[in-house]
UniProtKB/Swiss-Prot annotation:
This is DNA mismatch repair protein MutS. GO terms for cellular component: cytosol. GO terms for molecular function: ATP binding; ATP-dependent DNA damage sensor activity; damaged DNA binding; mismatched DNA binding. InterPro entries: DNA_mismatch_repair_MutS, DNA_mismatch_repair_MutS-lik_N, DNA_mismatch_repair_MutS/MSH, DNA_mismatch_repair_MutS_C, DNA_mismatch_repair_MutS_clamp, DNA_mismatch_repair_MutS_core, DNA_mismatch_repair_MutS_N, DNA_mismatch_repair_MutS_sf. It comes from Prochlorococcus marinus (strain NATL2A). ATP binds at G726, P727, N728, A729, S730, G731, K732, S733. Residues 1-60 are annotated as: Disordered. Belongs to the DNA mismatch repair MutS family. The keyword Repressor does not apply. This protein is involved in the repair of mismatches in DNA. It is possible that it carries out the mismatch recognition step. This protein has a weak ATPase activity. Keywords: ATP-binding, DNA damage, DNA repair, DNA-binding, Nucleotide-binding. HAMAP family: MutS (MF_00096). Residues 20-31 have a biased composition (Basic and acidic residues). Disulfide bonds: none annotated.
Length: 926
């Protein structure tokens, strides 16, 4: 009987692999399954395949694990670069090093049997980051042992996810054949996948409700070296979205990248020498410089989209954007190559991506990074949590597609009045049609992520369950189409792909449903994927397997009779195959021709020659079934992938419908109203911001036992600047944020929490709320505050919304007051943007006396007998007292400190009775 193969020596390294494979060639056919060998045959077998006794190596070459851990610090010793001679390595390790040289910046996972192994410096990295055992492996007689660490093949996704989260890129080297071809020493292996943070397709590695952006950026200095042009292209490989934009100024690019929060950013090698603008912000992956050249970029784009020229893209052939697009596609060609599709002998990516959409940097409401943090649009300012953000409050979507869509809307609100009103009207219709709204949401609730599912199918990485989910999603489209049988849905192009469902999709879903079982296995190579009756060859093989199973059942009964062992069972184990199991007490009664296979505590396991022969036949049939089912599945997956663009169009329509029904649900449940949006072309009214009884959309939902106090705002008609005064902790900052959030909600087309509203379109929203030291940059609180203020004053326009809170606190009283006063006048007289300036400097109330577009507002409080009550109501007029001492008392400051502060305040007021006054306006601000 053939000796079992040593899994380490036989499949991991070098010569033993070759010898075992040669032996295997000599044991084909019937000899391979002939387990009942005589003693003479066993001797002949041992002569053909001698087993070499393992002897210890030279003690000087053996490194124990403790020593290896100590030497892990000395990484250069274990780098593949420092090998004295690559030919001294075993064949498998030689191949590993060759692949590692091609992927020096990636962790190389090398498939060996049931594990992905890492060696040299990668093994040390893997061990540290994943906290797995670092072991060693013999690399050759002249080299000795080297570091080795590995992860199970079946758990590779989980471990790869951890590596990606830590910012690493991964190269997957998989086995390309089950066994070596004749004449080859090694199993054929090759790089099948490059996983980088921005090129992930695997479901478990992605956040369902966020886009995973891969970005490409290029900068180009003008001849005068003062103005920098830039282009930023971004793509989500999981959804196919492809957007490109251009701009000027490194600061603007910085804000765009902060807003984008890309998983990965690439650029041409050595093109960005000045790191000041992005250092500490992003990590840039350098890529082949020639891929970003204008000529090669054009060739890449034409090859990918099968175009004769690029004019149809609407991008100038000499623009920076052509280069960023071409570089991005080239990067995908490398990370996701489609080996089966070569055009002009060039490998194309198998990722299905849309045509690049040109984004006008002025087409949407601009919200800088500081404002995003201050308004807590997608995460809270304090701890970065989702709960408590605006998105948390208004996202009522039910699908992952819808969740990503509303995030995009809220991160980039539009200035398109027609688009806003269209969304508002659909929301209004759905608010009134509660039954329709509930039916649509019920249908959407179980909808899979068609965008990403179709992306995996297009890249030929989808599993059987992915295809079933795609079919289930498509099957819901006709029902949704019936729900959209209303005139209002015909007025928008959002839903064209649902209203006019492509017949090919229905046929595809039917084919998947008729062929793949309802709950298919995760593995694609072990069979059990398809129903009976879909392929005659598959049916014939399954018939053979049924015959073998019948024989197994009869064999169990027959062996019971022969052995008189009534509790005998014929069982199967993945490692041992088929065997006869009997209790320990009955083992002495087994027939002589039974061969003992395994002894357990309470059981003995045996095999018979006939059972082993039948097992070989069963394994052959199973292998043919698995191979055929995999071929059938790949054909079906390829067909599904060819429809990925059509599926994605339907998915985009579903995402819009999900967002709009969610916003309608929000409006209906929280008593929202439709704001009247004023077109920017209406000169007299375009800057109006009038909200009656507005409410903070987030705070209102957080309050459980209290009722939120609504407040009005009136800006843009006669008043451009509101000076808002009032005690500390009275709600001034909340009021500022409320106004900003309602403007953003209105410009995504949402209804808002208010009694009524008339709102003009804002081109930008700016906030300056609070500040902290930036220790990393060596900037004090006051300097941070001034930098933020300067940015606002240099970029705001008359159509902007500016929200300022307590400017001038970080310096002396007179300096702070002077700066606050001057900033207020600059906003009111020169920029004339719609602005609210919250302050504790009551002297600023005087500005309204000589500048007609300034008005004073205050937050009302009740103060009796040293007791302060916050009413949170904003009214016209200026406050004349800060009540800071009373706020300190409410905060829990010790009574002795509070009382002493009152005495000190009286003395200060007595000695400084004169108030600061400005008798005439500052002419320089005209």
């Amino acid at each position: 009987m053939a000796a079992s193969q040593n899994p380490i020596q036989g499949s991991l390294f070098g010569g033993n692999e070759e010898s075992d494979l040669n032996k295997a060639e000599k044991l084909k056919g019937s000899e391979r399954s002939n387990v009942n060998l005589s003693h003479q045959q066993l001797k002949e077998d041992a002569s053909l395949r001698p087993r070499i006794k393992q002897t210890p190596k030279n003690p000087n070459q053996i490194i124990d694990l403790d020593e290896l851990s100590r030497l892990a610090i000395e990484e250069p010793k274990w780098s593949h670069h420092n090998l004295p001679k690559i030919d001294d390595l075993t064949p498998a390790l030689r191949h590993y090093v060759e692949l590692k040289k091609e992927n020096p910046d990636r962790v190389l996972l090398y498939r060996l049997g049931d594990f992905f192994e890492c060696f040299f410096e990668d093994a040390i990295t893997l061990s540290k980051l994943l906290e797995i055992t670092l072991t060693s492996k013999e690399a050759g007689k002249k080299i000795g042992k080297i570091p080795m660490a590995g992860i199970p093949h079946h758990a590779s996704d989980r471990y790869c996810t951890e590596l990606i989260k830590k910012g690493l890129s991964i190269a997957i080297c998989d086995q390309l054949e089950a066994a070596p071809t004749k004449g080859n020493k090694l199993i054929k292996r090759g790089i099948t996948r490059l996983i980088t943070p921005g090129t992930i397709l695997e479901e478990g590695m992605l956040s369902a409700k966020k886009n995973n952006w891969l970005a490409s950026v290029l900068l180009e200095a003008k001849s005068n070296q003062e103005i920098i042009d830039w282009s930023l292209a971004k793509i989500d490989v999981s959804t196919g979205e492809f957007i490109v934009q251009e701009g000027q100024g490194s600061n603007n690019l910085r804000h765009e990248l902060i807003k984008l929060n890309a998983a990965e950013v690439i650029s041409e090698k050595k093109s960005i020498s000045n790191k000041i603008w992005y250092e500490g912000l992003i990590e840039i992956t350098e890529f082949n410089r020639t891929s970003f050249s204008n000529l090669e970029a054009i060739t890449t784009i034409k090859n990918h989209y099968c175009l004769n020229n690029i004019d149809s893209l609407g991008i100038h052939s000499n623009s920076l954007s052509i280069r960023t697009i071409g570089g991005l596609i080239s990067y995908l060609n490398k990370t996701h190559p489609n080996i089966d599709d070569k055009s002009n002998n060039e490998i194309k990516t198998n990722i299905c991506i849309d045509y690049p959409r040109i984004k006008n940097s002025r087409s949407g409401l601009i919200i800088d990074s500081q404002t995003r943090r201050n308004l807590e649009i997608t995460s809270t300012q304090k701890d970065g949590k989702f709960q408590g953000s605006l998105l948390w409050a208004i996202d009522k979507t039910l699908t992952a597609m819808g969740a990503r869509c509303i995030r995009r809307w809220i991160e980039e609100p539009t200035k398109d009045v027609n688009a806003i009103k269209n969304r508002q009207n659909i929301i209004g219709f759905l608010v009134k049609s509660s039954t329709l709204r509930k039916n649509i949401r019920k249908t959407l609730r179980a909808m899979g992520d068609l965008e990403r599912l179709s992306g995996r199918a297009g890249a030929q990485q989808a599993g059987a369950r992915d295809l079933v989910a795609i079919a289930e999603g498509i099957n819901r489209l006709p029902l949704i189409k019936n729900y959209l049988n209303e005139p209002i849905f015909d007025k928008t192009k959002y839903f064209d792909s649902i209203i006019n469902i492509d017949k090919d999709l229905i046929e595809l879903a039917s084919k998947i449903n008729n062929q793949i079982i309802d709950n298919p296995p995760l593995s694609l190579t072990e069979g059990g994927l398809f129903y009976d009756g879909i392929n005659p060859v598959l049916d014939g093989l399954r018939n053979q397997l049924d015959d073998h199973n019948i024989w197994l059942n009869s064999q169990e009964l027959e062996e019971r009779k022969k052995s008189n062992i009534n509790n005998l069972k014929l069982q199967y184990h993945r490692s041992f195959g088929y065997f006869l199991a009997v209790s320990k007490s009955k083992a002495i009664n087994v027939p002589d021709h039974w061969i003992r296979r395994q002894t357990l505590t309470n059981e003995e396991r045996f095999v018979t020659p006939g059972l082993k022969e039948r097992e070989g036949k069963i394994f052959q049939v199973r292998a043919r079934i698995s191979e055929l089912e995999y071929e059938l599945f790949c054909d079906l997956r390829k067909l599904t992938g060819s429809k990925s663009n059509i599926i994605r169009q339907a998915a985009k329509a579903i995402s819009h419908l999900d967002v709009l029904t969610g916003l309608a649900e929000l409006a209906a449940n929280h008593n929202y109203i439709q704001p009247q949006i004023i077109d920017m072309n209406e000169q007299d009214k375009s800057r109006k911001l009038s909200i009656i009884d507005g409410r903070h959309p987030v705070v209102e939902q957080i309050l459980v036992d209290k009722v939120f106090v609504p407040n009005d705002i009136e800006l843009g008609s006669k008043t451009d600047l509101i000076i808002l005064s009032g005690p500390n902790a009275s709600g001034k900052s909340c009021y500022l944020r409320q106004v900003g959030l309602l403007q953003i909600m209105a410009q995504i087309g949402s209804w808002i929490p208010a009694k009524s509203a008339h709102m003009g379109i804002a081109d930008q929203v700016f906030t300056r709320v609070g500040a902290v030291d930036d220790l990393a940059s060596g900037q004090s609180t006051f300097m941070v505050e001034m930098i933020e203020t300067a940015f606002i004053l240099n970029n705001a326009t008359e159509n902007s919304l500016v929200l300022l809170d307590e400017i001038g606190r970080g310096t002396s009283t007179f300096d702070g007051l002077s700066i606050a006063w001057s900033v207020s006048e600059f906003l009111a007289k020169k920029i004339k943007s719609r602005s609210i300036f919250a302050t504790h400097y009551h002297e600023l109330n005087q500005i309204s006396e000589y500048i007609e577009n300034v008005e004073n507002y205050k937050v009302v409080v009740e103060y009796k007998n040293h007791s302060l009550s916050f009413l949170h109501k904003v009214e016209r007029g200026g406050a004349n007292k800060s009540y800071g001492i009373e706020a300190a008392r409410l905060a829990g400051v010790p009574p002795d400190v509070v009382n002493n502060a009152r005495l000190i305040l009286k003395n200060l007021e007595k000695n400084n009775s004169n108030t600061i006054q400005i008798t005439k306006p500052i002419e320089s601000c005209k």
